[in-house]
Amino acid sequence: MMFRLTSVSCFLLFIVFLNLVVLTNACIPEGTYCQFNADCCLSQCCWGSCGNPCRFPGKREKLQEFFRQR
């Protein structure tokens, strides 16, 4: 009886641990690709990447981004 109780306890503890891992990895950090505001941890999804606050890029920033992608 004790073995069964221990096995069930370990199994339930494992399930709780997996749920915690999923909850802690639910958001993505700033600067990574996103589709919705809910994807970002504390940021907003701006033009496909997490940023806080949303930055409106100027000509120089757009040009630098163009060269970074090359």
Curated annotation (Swiss-Prot):
Example of a GO MF term: toxin activity
Annotated S-S bridges: 27-41, 34-46, 40-50, 45-54
Tissue expression from the record: Expressed by the venom duct.
Entry superkingdom: Eukaryota
Transmembrane segments: none
Propeptide regions on this chain: 61-70
Keyword hit for Lipid metabolism: no
Localization: Secreted
Pfam families xrefs: Conotoxin_I2 (PF17557)
Residues spanning the signal sequence: 1-26
Entry keyword set: Amidation, Cleavage on pair of basic residues, Disulfide bond, Secreted, Signal, Toxin
Record keyword Transcription regulation present: no
Proline amide: residues bearing it: 57
A GO cellular component entry from the record: extracellular region
Record's comment describing the protein's domains: The cysteine framework is XI (C-C-CC-CC-C-C).
Protein family according to the UniProt entry: Belongs to the conotoxin I2 superfamily.
Protein name as it appears in the record: Conotoxin Lt11.2
Species of origin: Conus litteratus
Native organism taxonomy: Eukaryota, Metazoa, Spiralia, Lophotrochozoa, Mollusca
